[in-house]
Amino acid sequence: MSLVPNTICLFDVDGTLTKPRNVITPEMKDFLAGLRTKVELGVVGGSDINKIKEQLGENCINEFHYLFAENGLLSFKDGSLLATQDIKKFLGEENIKKFINFVLHYIADLDIPIKRGTFVEFRNGMINISPIGRNCSQQEREEFEKYDLEHKIRPTMVSILKEKFQSLGLQYSIGGQISFDVFPIGWDKTYCLRHLPEDKYKTIYFFGDKTFVGGNDYEIANDPRITKSFTVTSPTDTKNFLSELFYKQ
């Protein structure tokens, strides 16, 4: 079967292909395997490659035509490494140290119901910050998300960091349930689009759940290269949109 020409579907991970921080279901895996025979598929996640593998499976780089970890700062095409970028070179160690020191002091003084561990996670192309700590349980994760919606813990912290470190040229993106990402301006999910040749891909569909202003899907969902973006609420929602696009008679 020939693929739909000049077309690719790009997917967020959390809330789009999987439930937040859950693994992909066998049903969704089978659905995507069938879809892959019809149209090219790509994944763009904010997490590092190991976390994406935890959710989508160890072999995921071979199951999509493109896989973009850390917004595309680590990129794979047809299972092979395509390109990498490094935030350490961009910011320099002194700026990174000042930024992380401030973040840790801020979280230490933050009064929230519970704290766990791994408040700062340094990745290849970004810094991930979690006020509650990334090694909280799934139940604690869900409780923090509700608390954050009411008390604006993450948005408040982001606004303070923006003001304090405005000279560094950083961008902040709230994604998932418990954390937010920090990266140089332009290193959001739109970064991955530079790896998709414009003369080949005339139609790009994007599927994501955090397409609101400040969400980590917002920039790519509104990029002029995206033909149409679909705001989804669950993997089932994603599957329904795809069925309408590619299986409707």
Curated annotation (Swiss-Prot):
InterPro entries: HAD-like_sf, HAD-SF_hydro_IIB, HAD_sf, PMM, PMM_cap. Mg(2+) 2 binds at residues 223, 227. It is an enzyme of class 5 (isomerase). GO terms for molecular function: metal ion binding; phosphomannomutase activity. It catalyses: alpha-D-mannose 1-phosphate = D-mannose 6-phosphate. Mg(2+) 1 binds at residues 12, 14, 209. One of its GO terms (cellular component) is cytosol. Involved in the synthesis of the GDP-mannose and dolichol-phosphate-mannose required for a number of critical mannosyl transfer reactions. Its EC number is 5.4.2.8. Keywords: Cytoplasm, Isomerase, Magnesium, Metal-binding. Belongs to the eukaryotic PMM family. Homodimer. The gene is pmmA. The keyword NADP does not apply. This is Phosphomannomutase 1. GO terms for biological process: GDP-mannose biosynthetic process; mannose metabolic process; protein N-linked glycosylation. Alpha-D-mannose 1-phosphate binds at residues 21, 123, 134, 141, 179, 181. Pathway: Nucleotide-sugar biosynthesis; GDP-alpha-D-mannose biosynthesis; alpha-D-mannose 1-phosphate from D-fructose 6-phosphate: step 2/2. Pfam families: PMM. The lineage of its organism: Eukaryota, Amoebozoa, Evosea, Eumycetozoa, Dictyostelia. Its main location: cytoplasm. It is found in: Cytoplasm. The active site is at residues 12, 14. The keyword Ribosomal protein does not apply.
